[in-house]
């Protein structure tokens, strides 16, 4: 049977299931395969292939939808890729610059630490943007965007995203300039504000399910009032003390000098608890669905505090208050 006798749909299915090198060779068999079979994924490649990508190589593949050019100084222009939807142009040595993305209509862009890209406001279908660190994208550069996910951690050039009514995930870690006014009215599902001293209150976000308010975050007890979280990071946060009303909370990170204490976890039905070095929590025996417990060092949890638990994973390193775990029949990881 000649290859041209195989239905094109079948050929395309075989082609998509092949690895990268096989695809390259398969296209070169006949003019027919070269014309009709196109490699669209230049993102999920092994590092040794990614490092070899250049402008000239990419120009031979004009149907690319997914491209990873992070830390690749040999790629600076992808503007000809009219089908491109996802681009990773992160890293300080990535060659892709402002001119190199002109007229692109991406869905997802990673420009973390790329100081050559400043403006993506023309990408009206952009839904995910990573503009963290030493990225040059500033407030004007995101004007009018309707994102679903934004990472602007440690980016002091972006301070306001409150018009993005469809935004669901926001990362404003550390030196991000996004402040209280900059998130006003947002209806997020996931928010990271760890070590961000400019945001204090997220209590109106009734659909928020995951909050990271660790470290020097200014979010306090009033700032989480009424939230119905599934996952909370409050490590080293001295302003949050009580989360006992969060009946759907399944994962709690409250280690270090977190102020969350025994009363603050009363009645919770967690699956995973991190209480390393937290001397204020001493008993979790009532958490009958708890599967992972981290009670390292000066954590207050003792033998009585784990009575009857059926854990899968336990880390009680340097905690001399826990001596017997023989009753945990399903324990398979002990650290």
What are these regions (language model features)?
Residues 44-50, 67-74, 88-96, 106, ...:
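Concave beta-strand-loop units of leucine-rich repeat
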Residues 23, 34, 38-59:
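Hydrophobic regular-secondary-structure patch
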Residues 53-60, 75-80, 95-102, 117-122, ...:
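Short, T/G/N/S-enriched strand-turn elements that build extracellular solenoid repeat scaffolds
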């Amino acid at each position: 049977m000649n290859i041209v006798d195989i239905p094109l749909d079948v050929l395309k299915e075989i082609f998509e299931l092949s690895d990268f090198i096989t695809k390259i060779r398969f296209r070169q068999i006949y003019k027919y395969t070269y014309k009709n079979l196109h490699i669209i994924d230049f993102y999920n490649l092994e590092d040794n292939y990614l490092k070899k990508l250049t402008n000239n190589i990419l120009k031979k593949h004009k149907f690319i939808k997914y491209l990873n050019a992070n830390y690749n100084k040999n790629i600076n222009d992808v503007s000809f890729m009219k089908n491109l939807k996802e681009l990773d142009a992160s890293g300080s040595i990535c060659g892709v610059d402002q001119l190199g993305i002109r007229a692109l209509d991406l869905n997802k862009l990673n420009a973390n630490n790329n100081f050559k890209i400043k403006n993506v406001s023309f990408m009206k279908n952009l839904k995910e943007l990573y503009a963290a660190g030493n990225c040059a994208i500033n407030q004007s550069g995101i004007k009018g965007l309707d994102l679903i996910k934004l990472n602007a951690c440690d980016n002091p050039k972006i301070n306001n995203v409150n018009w993005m009514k469809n935004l669901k995930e926001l990362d404003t870690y550390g030196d991000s300039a996004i402040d209280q006014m900059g998130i006003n009215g947002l209806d997020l599902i996931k928010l990271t504000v760890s070590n961000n001293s400019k945001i204090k209150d997220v209590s109106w976000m009734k659909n928020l399910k995951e909050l990271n308010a660790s470290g020097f975050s200014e979010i306090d007890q009033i700032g989480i009032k009424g939230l119905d979280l599934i996952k909370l990071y409050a490590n080293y946060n001295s302003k949050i003390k009580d989360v006992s009303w969060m009946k759907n909370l399944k994962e709690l990170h409250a280690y270090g000098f977190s102020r969350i204490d025994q009363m603050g976890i009363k009645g919770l039905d967690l699956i995973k608890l991190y209480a390393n070095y937290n001397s204020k929590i001493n008993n979790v025996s009532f958490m009958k669905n708890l599967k992972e417990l981290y009670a390292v060092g000066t954590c207050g949890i003792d033998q009585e505090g784990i009575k009857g638990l059926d854990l899968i994973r336990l880390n009680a390193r340097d905690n001399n208050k826990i001596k017997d775990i023989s009753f945990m029949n399903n324990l398979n990881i002990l650290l």
